[in-house]
A protein has these predicted regions:
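RNA/tRNA-interacting regions in translation and RNA-turnover enzymes
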Residues: 1-287
Length: 287
């Protein structure tokens, strides 16, 4: 059955709007839509594709995760794909999800419930206990290499400790600012005549997705040559390093592993905590 012209036209409008919103949110860290506005567009797109499955092509935002990788950073292919979370918007949708679970496995299993941190999703790889890679989620398969910045973020362990350290473990988590630090950062932005961040998530993304390593090299060269720009650069570098030091990390997932076997999410959290990785204390297992 062919798709009506009005449906295809609306699909194209929604795809364009959502892709632009994603670009501003994930790549430029300057969102123009509220979460509610974005969710409404996305829900309309899902409903349209459910009515006309022919529209659900690979170019649809419903078939992809996150945003494109910035050319500022080298690409990093995740060892295992990173997925995003699905949303429900009312009790009815949650009940429908429960019903699908029961239908799929025969009963409702114990569930781990956890508050979601709205931060920047990252993927960290530890090889023989040493942090060897830190990357953004990107499109779920390939992210941005921000490993150089990890050395300036005390919340990210550079080395695993305690427990039995696996040969390799890929962990996923959220980088974020506390509300208090976000308020301070926005006040600094305004005082410096810079635009404020729309929300803590975008402040965290803007802070992590900087080439501080290049700025440090440029600063050293400017100081050696006595360039006037050295003072300005020193202020930029100091601000970037200070903000990196304020970033927090909560680890909530495990990707590829070698020398580690986990069968339950709660056991995974226990293992991650034993290795010195920060996990949420806002969680509970419910039967």
């Amino acid at each position: 059955m062919s798709v009506p012209t009005h449906a295809r036209d609306r699909w194209e409008e929604l795809v364009a709007q959502i892709n632009e919103a994603r670009s501003r949110y994930y790549e430029r860290d300057r969102p123009t839509l509220s979460d509610e506005e974005y969710d409404a567009l996305y829900r309309e797109l899902v409903e349209l594709e459910n009515s006309h499955p022919e529209l659900a092509s690979g170019e649809s935002p419903t078939q992809t995760v996150g945003g494109e990788r910035s050319e500022m950073f080298d690409p990093v292919e995740h060892l295992e794909r990173m997925y995003s979370l699905d949303n429900v918007f009312d009790d009815g949708e949650l009940e429908a999800w429960f019903e699908r679970v029961v239908k799929g496995i025969g009963s409702l299993p114990p569930m781990l419930c956890e508050l979601k941190i709205d931060g920047l999703a990252v993927d960290a790889v530890y090889t023989k206990g040493i942090l060897t890679s830190l990357a953004t989620r990107g499109d779920g398969r390939v992210g941005e290499d921000v490993t150089a910045n990890a050395a300036h973020i005390p919340a990210i362990p550079q080395k695993l400790s305690g427990g039995t350290v696996p040969d390799l473990i890929e962990v996923r988590g959220e980088i974020f600012f506390t509300l208090a630090d976000f308020t301070t950062i926005n006040a600094e932005q305004l005082e410096a005549g810079l635009p404020s961040f729309a929300n803590p998530r975008n402040a965290a993304a803007g802070t992590l997705r900087q080439r501080v390593d290049k700025k440090l090299i440029e600063l050293r060269e400017s100081e050696r040559s006595g360039a006037r720009r050295a003072e300005t650069l020193r202020g930029e570098v100091d601000r970037a390093l200070r903000r990196l030091s304020l970033l927090r990390l909560t680890v909530h997932g495990i990707g590829a592993t070698r020398g580690l076997s986990i069968t339950q999410q709660s056991d995974g959290y226990t293992e991650l905590a034993s290795l010195g990785l920060p996990v949420s204390d806002r969680m509970d297992v419910r039967d």
